[in-house]
Amino acid sequence: MNANEEGEGSRYPITDRKTGETKFDRVESRTEKHSEEEKTNGITMDVRNGSSGGLQIPLSQQTAATVCWERFLHVRTIRVLLVENDDCTRYIVTALLRNCSYEVVEASNGIQAWKVLEDLNNHIDIVLTEVIMPYLSGIGLLCKILNHKSRRNIPVIMMSSHDSMGLVFKCLSKGAVDFLVKPIRKNELKILWQHVWRRCQSSSGSGSESGTHQTQKSVKSKSIKKSDQDSGSSDENENGSIGLNASDGSSDGSGAQSSWTKKAVDVDDSPRAVSLWDRVDSTCAQVVHSNPEFPSNQLVAPPAEKETQEHDDKFEDVTMGRDLEISIRRNCDLALEPKDEPLSKTTGIMRQDNSFEKSSSKWKMKVGKGPLDLSSESPSSKQMHEDGGSSFKAMSSHLQDNREPEAPNTHLKTLDTNEASVKISEELMHVEHSSKRHRGTKDDGTLVRDDRNVLRRSEGSAFSRYNPASNANKISGGNLGSTSLQDNNSQDLIKKTEAAYDCHSNMNESLPHNHRSHVGSNNFDMSSTTENNAFTKPGAPKVSSAGSSSVKHSSFQPLPCDHHNNHASYNLVHVAERKKLPPQCGSSNVYNETIEGNNNTVNYSVNGSVSGSGHGSNGPYGSSNGMNAGGMNMGSDNGAGKNGNGDGSGSGSGSGSGNLADENKISQREAALTKFRQKRKERCFRKKVRYQSRKKLAEQRPRVRGQFVRKTAAATDDNDIKNIEDS
């Protein structure tokens, strides 16, 4: 190309590369031509190298006349294709690039830039393009460059004022080598030559392929070791050395797009030469190009011998190593089988379908057509079987110990309540009730205390009455039964209820006379020592007479705590028999329990709200009203029970507030609230009066165009005279 063609358009300067001396002369003239314009735009530069007053500029900041790229590059000049649709931004970035000794080819949009690139006579080293442009965006231009046979080796640098992570990720994943955020800084433009240097090194084969193989064998071993430690600490026996293939399979020189993932592990064990310029802190971003030897959807793992060896050094357990070798398996077992190794070593094995296999050496649970079988070797359970004969206590201790391992995969399904499975439902009710009792209740020394941290939810709400004595000891009882009873089993239930009634009567005879429960004609007491609980049988839904439900005053005398603790076992014997009855209100299949205690006594009521009245109401829709004051509400759910007077408006919250001290606290609280409301009312009244008075005075003031004005002296005198005459 001759000099006339170069001077035709300042936007596309084309230099003849045959004569190097003529090229340098043109660069000098172009630099001197734009020096004044750059000074007017605030870009100070000094190209007077020979003057004594000039600044000492570093080598990379000097003009193209003094910079010799041949000293460390295979090219004499570096030509940058700048693609920017904004004229002002393009002019400033062009000036900065020329000040950094680059030759600039300008383009206003992507189509114009692609025309320049299609002409193979135009030598372009770097493409610096804007992302968002009309006609052809920067990403579209990037795709065209990468799909071209001869231009695919040119490094493309994206720039934009939108620095969102999604846009950056999209550009880098498409194949860009770097992303610059506007406004562009001069220090970022000075290091653009490093991309050209990487291309030269990769094409000549003297260095690494653009930093894709920066990860050495030592880095690989460290990553494997670290991942193994992480997998061991989290008790998930997965292959910790699984990583992504970070090798660059392109042999055509497109190595500047390297890995920038979290785990860059080379599968190939051969050591590779790492160049000094391919450091991790380089400014260019790197993108993964997967190796064709390993598909991207497969996970690459090292041989199992290395992993087993490291785990043997850590655990010294052959079984653990064998489990690690087959860590990802398809089959999943829901059965719980004991293992010989300790529980801490084989807590859970993570499957590929996110299933757990829990193993324990203490217990084995089988749910089938027969009764529930819970076997244990603990001496505490044997002692419990020998002492009281209450087998469900042993079930309670087992269920509390093994509740958390059972949770992920074992679900006790709802059992059908036919004649063949009535016994299973009874034992399940025993286990569920014993597992949900209050942990603070003291038994006769046979129940094993559980020290696990249990999340205890509060039963208080914004609509419940204020009772600090009951709220402090309130524990959620939950749903105490999940099997609904059918009509065809009503006869069996009546028989079992009568048997429980007879057994309870025998127990009352064994107790002292003054602490014996008073049983009416149509109701029976649930082993309460101080209260008369009305609980009717399904076959006789009558309302008993007042004489049958009368209570002697001698039975309300306080008893020692140890005496009541001895009766705790009797209170829990007939829980399942009581649960077999249908719900009294017919609202749901959930049995609501309200456990009220005075001096550690236990009182059971079904779907009832506890009030402070002194009489016990009877009937199928009644509630058990006791004389306990400030008792402990242990398992009350918001049921649908009715009050004792039969009005049907009971809330079932069970707040026992019959104590005189509680009444005093409530009265004090009400008095304080009344006083506060009165003060607030007076304060608001004062503000209202003050506002009204000021408003009245403001209306009386004279105004001129909406502004207040002062009265003149004459007007004031006239008003004074009028006031005197009126008076």
UniProtKB/Swiss-Prot annotation:
Regions of compositional bias (Gly residues) in chain numbering: 641-657
SMART domains: REC
Residues covered by the Response regulatory domain: 79-197
Alphabetical list of CDD domains matching this protein: psREC_PRR
Segments of skewed composition (Basic and acidic residues): 14-40
Record PROSITE patterns: CCT, RESPONSE_REGULATORY
A Pfam family annotated for this UniProt entry: Response_reg
Subcellular location: Nucleus
Major localisation: nucleus
Biased composition (Polar residues): 344-353, 467-487, 519-535
Location of the CCT domain: 669-711
Biased composition (Low complexity): 246-259, 538-555
Keywords from the named record: Biological rhythms, Nucleus, Phosphoprotein, Transcription, Transcription regulation, Two-component regulatory system
Post-translational modification: Phosphorylated. Phosphorylation varies throughout the diurnal cycle.
Keyword Isomerase in record: no
Chain intervals for the UniProt region annotation (Disordered): 1-47, 203-265, 291-312, 339-416, 464-487, 509-560, 606-670
Induction: Up-regulated by heat-shock and light at dawn, and down-regulated by the sugars produced by photosynthesis.
InterPro entries according to UniProt: ARR-like, CCT_domain, CheY-like_superfamily, Sig_transdc_resp-reg_receiver
GO (cellular component) term, any one: nucleus
Alphabetical GO biological process terms: circadian rhythm; cytokinin-activated signaling pathway; negative regulation of DNA-templated transcription; phosphorelay signal transduction system; red or far-red light signaling pathway; regulation of DNA-templated transcription
PANTHER family to which the protein is assigned, alphabetical: TWO-COMPONENT RESPONSE REGULATOR, TWO-COMPONENT RESPONSE REGULATOR-LIKE APRR7
Note: Regulated at the level of mRNA maturation and alternative splicing by SKIP. The expression of APRR9, APRR7, and APRR5 requires the presence of LWD1 and/or LWD2, indicating the existence of a positive feedback loop within the circadian clock.
Role summary: Transcriptional repressor of CCA1 and LHY, and positive regulator of LWD1 and LWD2 expression. Represses the expression of other clock proteins and master regulators of plant growth, development and response to abiotic stress. Involved in the positive and negative feedback loops of the circadian clock. Controls photoperiodic flowering response and temperature compensation. Expression of several members of the ARR-like family is controlled by circadian rhythm.
Family: Belongs to the ARR-like family.
Name the record gives this protein: Two-component response regulator-like APRR7
Organism: Arabidopsis thaliana
